[in-house]
């Protein structure tokens, strides 16, 4: 075996940011303390609390965006048409003329 090419293993403390648990593992990391976002004690997959999400494809997402845009434009034109009709049908008094 060649010398000075092998990784140096040392005990490293991993700190979970979600559940504040600490555990020590032999690792080749150079830091003595490492912060991780989530661990096996608090990850939903490992504790059995998975939430089912509906996954849509790209085409379905795009069509939903277009449908939402069409609905917005239809509501906008209806409101502007109603405002025009109200403006035309409003009777003016002599003082307003």
UniProtKB/Swiss-Prot annotation:
Keyword Ribonucleoprotein (UniProt): yes
Domain of life: Bacteria
A Gene Ontology cellular-component term: ribosome
Bias-annotated ranges (Basic and acidic residues): 84-97
Gene Ontology MF: a single term: structural constituent of ribosome
Coiled-coil residue windows: none
Job description of the protein: Binds the 23S rRNA.
HAMAP family the UniProt entry points to: Ribosomal_bL31_1 (MF_00501)
Subunit note: Part of the 50S ribosomal subunit.
NCBIfam families on file: L31, PRK00019.1
PANTHER family in UniProt: 50S RIBOSOMAL PROTEIN L31, CHLOROPLASTIC, LARGE RIBOSOMAL SUBUNIT PROTEIN BL31C
Name of the featured protein: Large ribosomal subunit protein bL31
Annotated source species: Mycoplasma genitalium (strain ATCC 33530 / DSM 19775 / NCTC 10195 / G37)
């Amino acid at each position: 075996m060649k010398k000075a090419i092998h990784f140096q293993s040392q005990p490293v403390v991993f700190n979970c940011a979600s559940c504040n648990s600490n555990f020590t593992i032999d690792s080749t990391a150079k830091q003595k303390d490492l912060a991780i976002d989530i661990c096996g004690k608090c990850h939903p997959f490992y504790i059995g609390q998975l939430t089912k999400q509906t996954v849509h494809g790209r085409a379905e997402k795009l069509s939903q965006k277009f449908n939402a845009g069409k609905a917005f434009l239809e509501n906008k034109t209806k409101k502007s048409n109603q405002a025009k009709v109200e403006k035309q049908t409003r009777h003016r008094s002599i003082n307003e003329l």
